[in-house]
Regions:
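C-terminal outer-membrane beta-barrel translocator/porin domains of Gram-negative envelope proteins
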Residues: 2-142, 146-150, 154-156, 198, ...
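Outer-membrane beta-barrel "beta-signal"
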Residues: 18-19, 176-183, 201-212
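Glycine-centered small-residue hotspots that permit tight backbone geometry or close packing
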Residues: 35, 97, 103, 169-175, ...
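Short amphipathic alpha-helix initiation/capping segments at coil-to-helix junctions
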Residues: 117, 121, 161, 165-169, ...
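Short basic/hydrophobic patches in alpha-helices and adjacent helix-turn junctions
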Residues: 130-133, 174-179
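A short pocket-lining beta-strand/turn micro-motif at the edge of beta-sheets
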Residues: 140-144, 168-172, 181-185, 202-204
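Outer-membrane beta-barrel transmembrane domain signature
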Residues: 150-172
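A short, acidic, flexible beta-alpha connecting loop/helix-capping segment that sits on the rim
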Residues: 190-195
């Protein structure tokens, strides 16, 4: 880690006000077939060393492209900046959630400081998925899907290394969403389409929990 990166480490005592706005018209939370969801989150600094404000906007819409098909498109935008024009803390830097860019290890792409991935001040992701015809009989609780992801993390306020911000990452793959008695399970098999030479890819991923 660089000296500048080490200077951002330490313990801090901060107070933030979190505001959430959620407009949901989905017909159901799991295996959604119609509707959309708009979410906006803002993290306002009340008492903070860096006075960092974080904004997040998430939009997802569902619909049918053909009979017995469900397709979705989502947008994820996030920013984190200091109101005092200071360098934000390492813990306040942005890493994309794992379901926003499948085919890559979480936190293992984007800006680097030496050998360390440090996240960015900005992130954006665009995700498209579409169900494919049922392969198994009596599989109402299982969705087979095809997906395409494109995303980027960029911006280093103290820039002291490789931003890698010009590289748009993208991936393609197939997945299974399965509603079980223990909860929703998700399995994905993905392949990176575009990436940076420093990125760490990940072909298979398993998640316990919802994918919406």
């Amino acid at each position: 880690a660089s000296d500048r990166q080490k200077s951002q480490e330490g313990n801090y005592w901060d107070i933030f006000l979190n505001l959430n706005f959620d407009y949901d018209t989905r017909n159901q939370k799991f295996q959604t077939t119609d509707g959309s969801r708009n979410r906006y989150f803002v993290n306002l600094p009340m008492i903070s060393e860096t006075s960092t404000i974080t904004n997040t906007y998430i939009y997802k819409i569902y619909g049918e492209m053909y009979e017995s098909n469900v397709s979705s498109f989502s947008v994820y935008l996030k920013s984190s900046n200091s109101l005092k024009s200071k360098d934000i803390k390492l813990s306040e830097r942005i890493l994309l959630p794992s379901n926003r860019l499948r085919g890559f290890e979480r936190g293992k792409f984007g800006p680097k400081d030496g050998d360390d991935f440090i996240g960015g001040n900005y992130a954006a992701a665009f995700n498209f998925s579409s169900t494919i015809p049922k392969i198994l009989e009596n599989s109402e609780n299982i969705d087979f899907l095809f997906f395409l992801d494109a995303a980027n993390v960029w911006g280093v306020d103290y820039f002291n290394g490789d931003d890698e911000g010009s590289e748009i990452r993208s991936s393609i793959g197939i997945g299974i969403d399965w509603l079980t008695p223990v909860g929703p399970l998700s399995f994905t098999l993905a392949e990176a389409i575009t990436k940076s030479s420093t990125d760490v890819t990940e072909s298979f991923r398993f998640n316990l929990g919802t994918t919406f």
